[in-house]
Amino acid sequence: MSDNLVQTYSIYIKAPAQRVWEAITQSEHTSRWGYGGDVEFDPRPGGVFNNLSTPEMKQMGMGDVAIEGKVIEIDPPHRLVLSWKASWYPDSEPTRVTWELTEFPSGLTRVVLTHDVTAAPQLAAEIAGGGDPQQGGGGWSWSLSGLKTLLETGVSMEESAA
C-alpha cells in the first residue's frame, strides 16, 4: 500500500455526521485525536484549513503550521475537500484530502477519507502508516482510530492509555 498514490480509508463511527464534522473541523476536538494540534478553519472555498503544530512538533523543529491547506469544496456535514501540504516536505506540491460523511438511520456515520498524494509521492508510505504511531508513523489509520475513539468514548487514545 505504501506505493499507492491514491489511498482510501473507510470507518464507521457511532455518532451523527454533525458530531463527526465538528470533530474534524473544530480545534476543541482536533487537539484530541490523531497527532493533536488545533486547526485554523475558514469554512468557504479558498479558506484556510491549517493543522497547527503541537509543542512536541515544535521541539522537533517544525514551524507553527504542521499541515497547510485550503478548502477546495465544502458541504457541511457531508463533504470536505482540502489541499494538504506537509511542512516537513517544504519543496513538495500540495496533495488533496477528501472527507465524505454518510449518516445512517442506525446512528452510524460512515467516514471515507481519500488522500491523493500523486503530487507528492514521497508521502505515500507515511500516510499509509505502519510505523510507530507515537513517533508520527501511524498515518491515517492512526488518526482515524483516534477520531473514532474520541467520538465513541469521549476520551482520546492517549487519555485512555494513561
Annotate the PLM regions.
Residues 1-40, 44, 162:
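Hydrophobic ligand-binding cavity/cleft-lining segments
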Residues 87-141:
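Beta-strand/loop substructures that line and gate deep hydrophobic ligand-binding cavities in soluble
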Residues 149-162:
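Short, highly charged C-terminal tails/helix-capping segments
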Residues 20-21, 30, 49, 71, ...:
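Hydrophobic pocket/interface hotspot
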Residues 11, 67-72, 95-103:
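Hydrophobic/aromatic beta-strand elements that line small-molecule binding cavities or substrate pockets
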Residues 41-85:
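Glycine-rich portal/gate segments that line the openings of hydrophobic small-molecule binding cavities
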Residues 17-18, 42-44, 72-78, 100-110:
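A short, structured loop/turn motif at beta-sheet edges
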Residues 4-10, 17, 48, 66, ...:
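Intrinsic-disorder/low-complexity, polar/charged segments enriched in Ser/Thr/Lys/Arg/Asp/Glu/Gln
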